[in-house]
């Protein structure tokens, strides 16, 4: 193992000089024994100097300190010993429950599986959330993005999906907290603990208060753990909250390394960095990774380069809308903006497809009529349009649902609605079977039978 010395420190960027015949490779991990800090090589500047990013705080460092090259990229613990544990970007335990005791460590930088190893999936993954199962169904082994601005419910939706899928699906899960609030990480841990599924979840956190190097690499740490489970032939769920913070950490690192920014100040390597991560989140013939990723949308602009780059990699996109949240309809998922590759009669069957498209066409017609209603009022509409508006308003409310994870705040018990029930309810609404019920009966209920029961109480 060769050793060098620090020659320059600028925040999280540290330049280290090595003998010219022992210059570290890009992505090699270097260790500063004093302060126990790990650095990752990003650039070779020539004359034996390498530019590195600190995976931890660089406070207290000084020029001339000795640095040792480990001659390999960062390695993190993998395997069943990681389950039920909380780790940082380097795989060190941060839950005060002793060492991980892993039998194997794997490099966080790996190639994506070869094309011939990949496996397509047609199997649907039922979530129990009406609007998702109906309009943007998830595929087992697929990639899902939850897009939304600040405060429209990305994390709550993700928590509900974890609650519904991780409990129903008896497989293993990996949760990567990338640049999100420490409180949310804490909430998630206790949520898992209370529901007795914590021993099936590995948690990796690089939260908001950490240096950019940690936030940039923590997604890869979580992914490496998920890949190990997949390569053992298991079906694993990977939750990433939040992909935007991964991009943002890349922007910070890119600026610190002195690269020219591209559009909106993002790093010039945005598409490549996203591709490196997303291409590894995939299912092979041995096992599957089903991933759910929250994507923050800056200023509610879906054309921003970061969310726009993420779109290309996903099978299902769930778009959360501020307008729907403002109406008090939760989950605030936009059924017209959200899409899925699975919404195909060959995959989901003809009945489901026709009901989903029927719901979308009624809501689209209502959207078009809103301007006329605002100017002239409901009375000027034709009888057919009046009927469409009334049905659309009922459908809108029926797309809402009480969540298990929000029980503490709402006081109403959460509901898991099976797909068959969802299709039956919306099919009846489109056919006009429930035109006589008041629209308030459809708000915040589970299945259609509950809506009928609620209507009886309202009378």
UniProtKB/Swiss-Prot annotation:
InterPro entries: AAA+_ATPase, ATP-synt_VA_C, ATP_synth_F1_bsu, ATPase_a/bsu_AS, ATPase_alpha/beta_chains, ATPase_F1/V1/A1_a/bsu_N, ATPase_F1/V1/A1_a/bsu_N_sf, ATPase_F1/V1/A1_a/bsu_nucl-bd. The keyword Translocase applies. It is a peripheral membrane protein. Its EC number is 7.1.2.2. Coiled coil: none annotated. GO terms for cellular component: plasma membrane; proton-transporting ATP synthase complex. Disulfide bonds: none annotated. Keywords: ATP synthesis, ATP-binding, Cell inner membrane, Cell membrane, CF(1), Hydrogen ion transport, Ion transport, Membrane, Nucleotide-binding, Translocase, Transport. SMART domains: AAA. GO terms for molecular function: ATP binding; ATP hydrolysis activity; proton-transporting ATP synthase activity, rotational mechanism. It catalyses: ATP + H2O + 4 H(+)(in) = ADP + phosphate + 5 H(+)(out). It is found in: Cell inner membrane. Belongs to the ATPase alpha/beta chains family. F-type ATPases have 2 components, CF(1) - the catalytic core - and CF(0) - the membrane proton channel. CF(1) has five subunits: alpha(3), beta(3), gamma(1), delta(1), epsilon(1). CF(0) has three main subunits: a(1), b(2) and c(9-12). The alpha and beta chains form an alternating ring which encloses part of the gamma chain. CF(1) is attached to CF(0) by a central stalk formed by the gamma and epsilon chains, while a peripheral stalk is formed by the delta and b chains. This is ATP synthase subunit beta. It comes from Cellvibrio japonicus (strain Ueda107) (Pseudomonas fluorescens subsp. cellulosa). The gene is atpD.
């Amino acid at each position: 193992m060769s050793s060098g010395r620090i020659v320059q420190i600028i925040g999280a960027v540290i330049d280290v000089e090595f003998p010219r015949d022992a210059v570290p490779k890009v992505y090699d991990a270097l260790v500063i024994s004093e302060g126990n800090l790990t650095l990752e090589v990003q650039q070779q500047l020539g004359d034996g100097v390498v530019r590195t990013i600190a995976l931890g705080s660089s406070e207290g460092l000084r020029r001339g300190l000795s640095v040792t090259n480990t001659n390999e990229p960062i390695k993190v613990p993998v395997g069943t010993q990681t389950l039920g544990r909380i780790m940082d970007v380097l795989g060190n335990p941060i839950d005060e429950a002793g060492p991980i005791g892993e039998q194997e460590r794997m490099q966080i930088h790996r190639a994506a599986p070869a094309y011939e190893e990949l496996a397509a999936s047609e199997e649907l993954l039922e979530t129990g959330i009406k609007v998702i199962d109906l309009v943007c169904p998830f595929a087992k082994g697929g990639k899902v993005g939850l897009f939304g601005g600040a405060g429209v419910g990305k994390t709550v939706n993700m928590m509900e999906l974890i609650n519904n899928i991780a409990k129903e699906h008896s497989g293993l899960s990996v949760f990567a907290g990338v640049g999100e609030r420490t409180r949310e990480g804490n909430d998630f841990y206790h949520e898992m603990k209370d529901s007795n599924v914590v021993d099936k979840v590995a948690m990796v956190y690089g939260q908001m208060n950490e240096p950019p190097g940690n936030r940039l690499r923590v997604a890869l740490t979580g992914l490496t753990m998920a890949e190990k489970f997949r390569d053992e032939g298991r079906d694993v769920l990977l939750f990433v909250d939040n992909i935007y913070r991964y991009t943002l950490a890349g922007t910070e690192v890119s600026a610190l390394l002195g690269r020219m920014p591209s559009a909106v100040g993002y790093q010039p390597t945005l598409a490549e960095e996203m591709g490196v991560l997303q291409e590894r989140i995939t299912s092979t013939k041995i096992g599957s990774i089903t991933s759910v990723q929250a994507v923050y949308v800056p200023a509610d602009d879906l054309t921003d380069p970061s969310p726009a780059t993420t779109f290309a990699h996903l099978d299902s996109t769930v778009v959360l809308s501020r307008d729907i949240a403002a109406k008090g309809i939760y989950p605030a998922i936009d059924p017209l903006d959200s899409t899925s590759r699975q919404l195909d009669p060959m995959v989901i069957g003809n009945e489901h497809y026709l009901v989903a498209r029927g719901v979308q066409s009624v809501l689209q017609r209502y959207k078009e009529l809103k301007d006329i209603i605002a100017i002239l009022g409901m009375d000027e509409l034709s009888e057919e349009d009046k009927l469409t508006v009334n049905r659309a308003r009922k459908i809108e409310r029926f797309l809402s649902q009480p969540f298990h994870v929000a029980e503490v705040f709402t006081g109403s018990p959460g509901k898991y609605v099976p797909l068959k029930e969802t299709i039956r309810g919306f099919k009846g609404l489109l056919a006009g079977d429930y035109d006589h019920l008041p629209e308030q009966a459809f708000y915040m209920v589970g299945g259609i039978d509950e809506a009928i029961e609620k209507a009886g109480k309202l009378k």
